[in-house]
């Protein structure tokens, strides 16, 4: 039984989340999306990322009853895709003629972050992030960003204007 439990735990992607206990979720009905902070991406790449992930975020927010308001939103939603090189590995590859040469591998590490900020107080009310590399390796979908966004929003269980978390908002 323990082995089965460990197997299922290792198959689900790890989502790290924060929720502000003092936030008044009953007052949140509208939102506005700020474009991804993308210092590391070119303008073309940034637009492509935004265009791919934004519809999934809009779906999740509208499923919770939130409406878009560009003038006076209750919350500001910001998302970011973070990546960089990690763990350079040196390997000495030999051949039959005893000539050795170094081989350096740089793995690309990435994460997706979504956060909601109260537009009046400017305080963070919710934040969720996921290791995109591990999640994307395990997925067979056409666009794995959808599943990533769903995993992130499975930690935000608030309908618009309702301070009580609703477990039925989780998607499996």
Please annotate each region the language model reported.
Residues 44-55, 104-107, 139-147:
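Soluble non-cytosolic domains of exported or imported proteins
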Residues 1-11:
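Sec-dependent bacterial lipoprotein signal peptides
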Residues 64, 75-125, 131-134:
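Surface-exposed short loop/turn segments
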């Amino acid at each position: 039984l323990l082995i089965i439990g460990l197997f299922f735990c290792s198959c689900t992607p790890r989502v790290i989340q924060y929720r502000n206990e003092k936030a008044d979720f009953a007052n949140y009905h509208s939102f506005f999306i700020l474009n991804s902070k993308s210092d590391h991406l070119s303008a073309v790449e940034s637009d492509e990322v935004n265009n791919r992930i934004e519809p999934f975020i809009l779906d999740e927010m509208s499923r919770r009853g939130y409406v878009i308001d560009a003038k006076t939103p209750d919350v500001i939603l910001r998302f970011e895709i973070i990546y960089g090189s990690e763990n350079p590995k040196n390997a000495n590859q030999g051949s039959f003629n005893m000539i050795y040469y170094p081989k350096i591998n740089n793995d690309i590490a990435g994460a997706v972050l979504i956060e909601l900020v109260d537009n009046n107080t400017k305080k963070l009310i919710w934040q969720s992030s996921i290791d995109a590399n591990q999640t994307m390796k395990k997925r067979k979908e056409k666009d794995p960003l959808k599943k990533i966004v769903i995993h992130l929003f499975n930690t935000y269980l608030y309908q618009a204007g309702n301070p009580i978390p609703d477990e039925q908002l989780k998607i499996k």
